Amino acid sequence: MNWTRISSILIVGFTAVGAIYGGLSMVFMPSGGLLSLSTGLLDGSPFVDYLVPGIFLFVFVGLFHLAALIYLLKKLPRTKEVMFAAAAVLAVWMVVQLLIIGYVFILQIIFLVVAAVEMFLAIQLKKQQQ
């Protein structure tokens, strides 16, 4: 197993776990209390609480990254494409979040970087396959 594959498994797995945990935390406590989030962050957004953002985070970022992790672990066809798409979803999620609530946490920037790293790794895996 090479460094690109190991790095991909680690970063995609970390992102999946974080997004699933964060999304479920928002769904189970839409006030944001489990994550120490204030609903005041949502002022000016279309959301009154974290329920809908939690569902989106869980389904689109968390489960998509979980699918990418399964593809990576099982070495399924189209793994690189699934991984790249999951990274793109994460990037879109973070950009939309920044547009809606603005810059609040360093994690927003960190996860934008994570999305870029995931895209880079997916491209590297694709190159190694050729």
Where are these regions (language model features)?
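Topology signature of small-to-medium multi-pass alpha-helical membrane proteins
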Residues: N2-Q130
